[in-house]
Amino acid sequence: VLERAITKLNKNMKADKTLGKQVALLERVKVWLETGKCVRAMELDDEEKEIISSMDLLTYKPVIYVANVSEDEVASEDNEYVSKVSEFASTEGAGCVKICAEIEAEMAALEDDERELFLEDLGIEESGLDKLIKASYSLLNLISYLTAGEPEVRAWTITKGTKAPQAAGKIHTDFEKGFIRAETIAYDKLIECGGSLVKAREQGLIRSEGK
């Protein structure tokens, strides 16, 4: 991919001298890759990042390293191999999540209340899968918001910082076009009210979000 791009840019440089900076950058990236390193570990300025992003290079994409451990070690913080994976991930500016696939498989067959008791018995506050999902959302700059009604409660995934009209558009394009305002509440606050919007409204926790 890089070699083709460099060749094409070199040909076009005769007509556009401003492409020289791009060629120099891609040459630098090519040398970096030949040393066996990932592009995401390179130090790049904002302009260079924008250029590289357009290349769709696999080793520039954000990653999370997942360390699979045994059930006996899932609650321990002293696993030598997890430490090594975490140290390697940090060289790329990446995160590391520890899970026990065996435990996750067992929990998949349990009801929600049974899962909580299962985790308590193991001395774990949060499942590895939940940690991985949260880390993935953070890495991709995503959040979820919930809509609730008589038929169902549903989660919608949006990019962090998305405005209310565009968030509504995730449900249906008509909602974005005709958006006036939405009533919202933080999830934790709603849970504190026992899931009751009436109680939340009485406590002044409902916010009205306009455009």
What feature does the model see in each segment?
Residues 3-211:
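C-terminal-of-GTPase-core extension/linker across diverse P-loop GTPases
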